[in-house]
């Protein structure tokens, strides 16, 4: 049926009018303003979560050594648990008056049994700290002064000699004066860690070595009178700090950054930290985080921990079966590398000591006490050191010594009775049971899987330049 043109026009107007009314009603029903607001809220949440995540990863990697150090400082200067292994108030020393054995290792990982340890946590926020060292008459000792950024300076035989000395630990901006007989040692952060080692040459030397360690003491400058203080300090009980893996990490980082001077070249980075409430110019409060911010930071913690764990393998190079880490003690802007090193512990500068380690033999198989091994040094391959060297074996699962029948936990150039061949070479026997022949050169090893750690104190330049490496580990 055909309609006249006039009727067709009226019909189209009616249909179009109805459609317009329908769309107006639909728009009123769906409220475009609410659609825009909803999308904006999603965008804001995405931005907040992404910023918290990306900046949070950077902040976690940057702050890892700071929080590791401040947590340990709190836990070892307060009584935080029953039968605590290490405790000494701030600016006091804790002395291990014994060589490390399986029974006395405490919380030390892969400890040495060649030196007496002593340690303390310093706080020079208000005034310098005096460090007294006695005349060791050439005996090896070292004190590693580690700041909150895990960077190290040394007092000891290599750097300051072995005569009786007085030092003052000061911050870079300290403007006071010291007596002429006190040498300033600058450390970048007002808080940090002192870890000392003093050589013991044998059981008959133990008493004298302990006496020397007792003559190493600390005293705030304002109390200094040339003599160690007998002042008693009150023991303080406290809850244990453990911030890693939680939002408490960022709260502690925020508190710590507020106490530290701005480092050159880091202003922009710390300004970013401010954006998520972690930097030094704001105050972090986990209770005020929005759900997207919380989600982003929690994700950042997990991924940053994974990055650090993966990066621990990049800090070590393997040569001839031995893994040697030389790039420690000074880090600059290499925050991931710094965190990876701290994950495994704190070390001396390479010039002070190096620690080649091995978990595989010359064929790439895991070392196990069910087999026997041999390491042979020809005369020109003996470790080139100005201090001393030694070799120790540890259980692989926990980096601790395993008891053995002769109580020997290291062997090296200072071991009494060690035997060289006619040409001046040296062969070390590594096995769980006592060798059939002479045992002078025997290092007992754990029954199961184990790792070897060689210690090179005051390594010569050829070691630092990779011109010397330990010989391979031969499975017999």
List each model region and its residues:
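Hydrophobic core
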Residues: 23-28
